[in-house]
Amino acid sequence: MTDKFNEVVILAAVRTPIGTYNGSLKDIRADQLGSIVIKEVINRSNIDKEEIDEVIMGQILTAGMGQNPARQASINAGLSKSIPAYLVNQVCGSGLRSVISGYQTLLLGESKYVICGGQENMSLAPHVLNYKNEKKLSKEKLIDTMIYDGLIDAFNNYHMGVTAENV
């Protein structure tokens, strides 16, 4: 192990506008928002996109998004398919966790340039129906994935707003 860690700096910080539920961003998928941000990070940082070693994105609501939305965002931003990209889901801390993970890989010298952040669109979180066992639809309930996967504590069964007040 080395006695000296690498110096880590942020070359560019970018975000999309904060939208409202079913507002002006309601039809833009999370991976598309992520792709826009990745392109702008590369533009502002003045580094060649071929120098990017890794992309780490935080996202909670992935139902119906297809495999690895972080990779979708990365490739659609024009990055090489050879650049690894992965998704972090640590609920409300997902974007921050991606930055911490990026920091760690840079600190240890595993990468030179890492793009990390978060991507989400709560307006596009689908309602799902468990219909695999061929039950009658009249007995099934739709599940709002925005609420169930993103906003309800899995252990205490209450809204994350209550969790915030309890913390």
Task: Label the predicted regions.
Residues 14-18:
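Short polar catalytic/cofactor-binding loops
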Residues 2-8, 20-49, 66-67, 74-167:
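Acyl-thioester C-C bond-transforming condensing/cleaving domain
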Residues 59-65:
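Glycine-rich phosphate-binding loops at beta-strand->alpha-helix junctions
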Residues 51-58:
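Short glycine-rich phosphate-binding loop at a beta-alpha junction
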